[in-house]
Amino acid sequence: MALSPKRVKYRKVQRGRVKGDATRCNAVDFGAYALVCLEPFWLTSRQIEAARVALNRRIKRGGKLWIRVFPDKPYSKKPAETRMGKGKGSPEYWVAVVKPGTVLFELMGVERALAEQAMLLAGSKLPIKTRFAERVQEI
């Protein structure tokens, strides 16, 4: 179930930079527990899928899982042993641009201990530092 957009306006995009902390998607909105990233990074659809599979296997279909990031940026690459020039390479895979503080996954319907174990396991599948977070109760 590798995530990718159904259709895009432009096939190739410029790289850009990941600057600053997350101002959106930085709160636990849907579930009770979350996995938050602490570093700026481009997460690939395969990395997101690996973390999702690890989470689902750990909770054993017990709770509800939300994936809060979506890979919508194409990553282009030139073939091996190709000389420079002759235009931009073809799109290889899709990445999600995440800033520090972005919520990656949310979970609900399981105990706190199991949720923490599952989130730490999912975080170990990702090449960035992550932390476990809980929803703040509003009064």
UniProtKB/Swiss-Prot annotation:
Its domain of life? Bacteria
Q: Does the keyword Methyltransferase apply?
A: no
| Keyword tags | Ribonucleoprotein, Ribosomal protein, RNA-binding, rRNA-binding, tRNA-binding
InterPro entries documented for this protein:
Ribosomal_uL16, Ribosomal_uL16_bact-type, Ribosomal_uL16_CS, Ribosomal_uL16_dom, Ribosomal_uL16_sf
A Pfam family (short name) is Ribosomal_L16
**Gene3D superfamilies linked to this entry:** Ribosomal protein L10e/L16 (3.90.1170.10)
PROSITE patterns (UniProt xref)? RIBOSOMAL_L16_1, RIBOSOMAL_L16_2
Q: Which GO terms describe its cellular component?
A: cytosolic large ribosomal subunit
Can you supply a Gene Ontology BP term from the record?
A: translation
Known CDD domains for this protein? Ribosomal_L16_L10e (cd01433)
Kindly list the GO molecular function terms attached to this UniProt entry.
Answer: rRNA binding; structural constituent of ribosome; tRNA binding
Q: Which family does it belong to?
A: Belongs to the universal ribosomal protein uL16 family.
Role played = Binds 23S rRNA and is also seen to make contacts with the A and possibly P site tRNAs.
- Subunit description: Part of the 50S ribosomal subunit.
State the protein's name.
Answer: Large ribosomal subunit protein uL16
Species lineage? Bacteria, Pseudomonadati, Spirochaetota, Spirochaetia, Spirochaetales
